[in-house]
Amino acid sequence: MASKEPQHRPETIAITAGRPEVGADSALNQPISLNSTFVAGGAIGYGRYGNETWTALEDAIAALEGGKTLSYSSGMAAISAVFSTLPVGAKVVASDQGYSGVMTLLGNLSAAKKVSVNFVAIADTDAVLAALEGADLLWIESPTNPSLDVAELPTLIKHAKARNILVAVDNTFATALLQKPLEMGADIVMNSVTKYLAGHSDVVLGSLSTNDPIQFKALEDARKFNGSIPGPLEAWLALRGIRTFPLRFQRASENAMELAKRLSQHPLVTRVRYPGLPTDSQHLKAKAFMKGFGAIVSFEYAGSAAAADKVCESSKVVTYATSLGGVESLWERRRRWPIESASVPETLIRLSVGCEDVEDLWIDIEAALLAGK
């Protein structure tokens, strides 16, 4: 009886997946395919339909998420592809707190009467289940951006699928290292590859993973005919980033836990949001099915919005910038953006914790907190 291939762990998958076939003098790394045109008779056909470098990146993400994967020119391009497959008038259930780009897009689609949207508190399981009646799509972001609310994924997915509702999960904050929604029964998993997967703040990419061949074809057509294709150089950079993704994410998560503990004791911080803290309202839910708590810490500053801005402007190690998931620590007051949800507190600062020495980070953060007074 032939032995089965070993089931590798994520740390091994990140390093081994998406490599060229092994042979004498074969390249260890996938080359960058700078081609718009391909000789007839092959599987690609044209540069908008496929690219060997995309395929390598998609193979790596697929191995991590456990589903066939498509890469897109950005996370928003991937998200838009999902919504573009819905029929006119489709009912969408989504979180009332989450990535502002998604909430804005859904608001625009609703205003144009292309979909109807029911925004609910995604951490309130009963409220979500009540909203599922007649829904076509349940869009879940968990943990949410920037409030770090946690959805009970196993329960929500189970009930939605029992009603034949399409379920899509934004897995950007948790990543496949902490939760695998496809294994729970979700139809689609979205990643902003820009963030932890690529991890170096130098590319903008997105991905969708699914085990449903019909969904895959629809999403592939959306990419093909909307032109939301990734560049081969960006795909190559993201693939290189994936090689160190588990190492980076582990270090950043360890730093985040330590900083969350210290921030929760600081007199200039009124509230810390981090599911890893036993005192956090989301802790028990996260602990029940997640394998960790991630590398984002959100906290509210004890002062005005202007004072919170001054905190972010005063740091030397932590960079005052939008985005997250890179090796460097970033922070910002989220309500400085007009499109951010009004339910997010004015003084909430989202801290994307990087891989620096945690003591250097704390010295910098503490000095910045004092500078905001």
Residue ranges and their predicted role:
Residues M1-G45:
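N-terminal glycine-rich, Lys/His-bearing helix-loop that initiates the first secondary-structure elements
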Residues Q30-T85, G101-S110:
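Conserved N-terminal alpha-helix of the aminotransferase class I/II PLP-enzyme fold
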Residues L28, L34, R223-K310:
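Structural motif of enzymes handling amino- and sulfur-group chemistry
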Residues S209, S298-E300, S352-G354:
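Short hydrophobic/aromatic beta-strand micro-patches
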Residues V203-L205, G292-I296, E346-R350:
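Short, solvent-exposed beta-strand edge segments and adjacent coil->beta transition regions
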Residues G107, R248, E313, S329-K373:
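PLP-dependent enzyme catalytic core of the Aspartate aminotransferase-like
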Residues N226-G227, S314-G325, A368-K373:
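A common structural junction motif
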Residues A2-Q7, T16, P20, T69-L268:
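Conserved PLP-enzyme active-site core in the AAT-like
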